[in-house]
């Protein structure tokens, strides 16, 4: 199985680093659903870029790619 590619981006509004994973050409933020009925989603936030990259590297099926661009 190929590894999914991921990158980290600083979000000014959230004041945190967010991880995005490439899923079939779409860059999706990492997080979790906190209320499915209301469609509420919470981002997985990191204090530093290094923490975000360490999280990516700790996952066996995800690989960090600094060249992915989140728009």
Question: Could you say what each language-model-derived stretch is?
Answer:
Residues 1-34, 67-70:
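Short N-terminal "domain-start" leader segments
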Residues 32-64:
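A short, charged, amphipathic alpha-helix used as a generic interaction element across diverse proteins
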């Amino acid at each position: 199985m190929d590894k999914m590619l991921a990158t980290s981006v600083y979000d000014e509004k959230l004041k945190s680093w967010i991880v995005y994973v490439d899923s079939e050409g779409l860059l999706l933020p990492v997080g979790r659903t906190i209320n499915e009925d209301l469609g509420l989603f919470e981002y997985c936030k990191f204090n530093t870029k290094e923490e975000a990259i360490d999280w990516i590297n700790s996952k066996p099926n995800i690989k960090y790619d600094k060249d992915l661009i989140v728009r």
